[in-house]
Structures are given as structure tokens and as C-alpha cells.
């Protein structure tokens, strides 16, 4: 999803596609030049090198070790470099150059890919893929502080009064990284070709249900290949959700062929969102208080 949204912001990609599906990821996921410089300097320091020329001679093993070390360094919040805070990925694409002049959201606001029809959305519990255990209150508050979203946490606590710290962390990180960027992309395209929004809510039964509607779970549904090796482990025990896969796959194919997935386009008035689950339906402006909590933050 991040890659598709980035391509939509690249002038050199203009005219190469008529439809785009930034799936589980949209805007907000590039680095500015100054952040990229910090990442590059740290990466080279890990290798004990000083230039790109020297890097070309480094072994693949050494590069991978340095990459992991650099990722860990920025994941700890040390040398924080962009608006993702403690969840930063240091190896995002870099904007502010000829290939990617602006970040994807600014590009969309300026009319980039305005003739391209877009289908975008996210899964309800994206970040359980990286966090299925217990979460301390301290970790929750530290993460939210990194997002500068303490007020948003208060809103989620009101809308989810029975939620544990772990549940709140999953909800907030999912929205910060996936749902809100997709919404911002759709909002930025109000005068462009239609944008359609979905949310995948079907819960995996694997690991006693701990994954819920996690990141990438929607992929075998969209491609209608639930029978592929390994997918059953991701789905968990129980009857096959083939009916949902048929429905979702048809929507994706219809959108690819015609630009229409089968539900109303997203706008700032109705915010129509297709919920994919055992029972699927269009919901207008889901979780409005939580969405509004990110205004001015994300």
C-alpha cells in the first residue's frame, strides 16, 4: 500500500495505470531529505564506511547486519527522524527529489494522479501481527506520546471503556499507521477521480484469535487463493470463509476492470466504507470520534 501511494506521487509514473489499490497503507510513509541523511549516516557508521562507493564493495551479509542495526536504532526512538515517532521505518522512500518531489499526501492535494481511480483501506487490527502479547500501560503511553496523541488516547479510552492496554495500543497504532493515512488520501482526492474505501474486519482464528483482523490477512481473500499452502495456518481452524473470499475477489476484479468495486465512492459527507466480514455492508463514517481525534495530529 505504501509503495502504491508513493508511485501515485511520482511524475514519471503518470499515465502508466488507470486504477490503483493502496491496500493496507497509503500516505505519510516517506522520509524528507534531512531524515534520510541521518539514516544514511547511521547506516554507514554501522558498516564503518564513509561513502556510497565503499558501500558497493560491502558484502550482502554485512549490509543486512547494518540494516537490522539501523532499524533497531530508530525503532528505539534514538535519533527520531520523522512523524512516525517510535514506529519509524528508516528505509522508506525519500521525497524532495526529481523522482518523488513531494510526500504522497502533498502530491495528492496538488492533484497528482487525479485521473486515477483509487480503492484504499485497511484491516481492523493491523498491528497485532507485530504485537500479540500483553502490553503495559507504560508502553502504551510511551507509544502514544511518540505520536503526540495523548488526547487521542483519551478518546479511545472513552469509546472503548473495556479495552485493555494491549487493545488500545493495537487500535491506536493501526489507525496511526494505516487507517488515518488512507482516510487522508481519500480526503485529499475529493476533486479527483473517485476513491473507494474498505475495512477488512474478518478475524483470524489462529493463535486462539489473537491475530484478529491482522495485517496482510486480507490478501488471500482479495486474490481468492485460500487454498494455497500456508494460508490455512493464517486463517486458523474452522470452516473456510470462501464466501467472503468470493465477494472480496469480485469487488477487486470489478474495480480493476471497470473502476467500480460495487459501493459508493468516499466523500467527506458520508465517508462510505465497505466492511468485509462474514456479513458485509457499507457503513457511513465508522468510528467518527476516533477518526476526529487525529485531526491536527495525523
Segments and roles (model prediction):
Residues 1, 36-40, 216:
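Amphipathic alpha-helical segments in well-structured domains
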Residues 1-3, 27-30, 127-129, 204-207, ...:
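Flexible loop/turn segments at secondary-structure boundaries
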Residues 23-25, 167, 233-238:
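A short, mixed-charge helix-start or loop-turn motif at secondary-structure junctions
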Residues 180-298:
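Mobile gating loops/cap/lid regions near enzyme active sites that modulate substrate access
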Residues 2-13:
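Short glycine-enriched nucleophile-adjacent loop
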Residues 132-147, 266, 270-272:
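Short Gly/aromatic-enriched secondary-structure transition segments
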Residues 122, 149-191, 196-201:
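Alpha/beta-hydrolase fold catalytic core
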Residues 14, 19, 23-142, 169-174, ...:
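Substrate-access "cap/lid" subdomains that shape
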